[in-house]
């Protein structure tokens, strides 16, 4: 595997972990001052995650 392929997969894994943590945080903290901004951030992070998955699939790296 080339360096960019490893970085792409690593980025997807790290982003997936962060998405999970943010989603759990928002579920438990609906009264947080920046809830709306964090909820929008979560949506964008999920969209970016989907793009990374598509790139990985196109590169034939997803099993």
Language model regions located:
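Extended, charge-rich alpha-helical interface modules
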Residues: 1-63
């Amino acid at each position: 595997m080339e360096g960019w392929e490893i970085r792409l997969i690593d980025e997807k894994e790290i982003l997936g972990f962060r998405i999970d943590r943010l989603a759990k945080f928002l579920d438990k903290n609906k009264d947080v001052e920046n809830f709306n901004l964090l909820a929008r951030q979560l949506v964008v992070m999920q969209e970016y995650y989907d793009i990374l998955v598509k790139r990985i699939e196109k590169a034939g790296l997803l099993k």
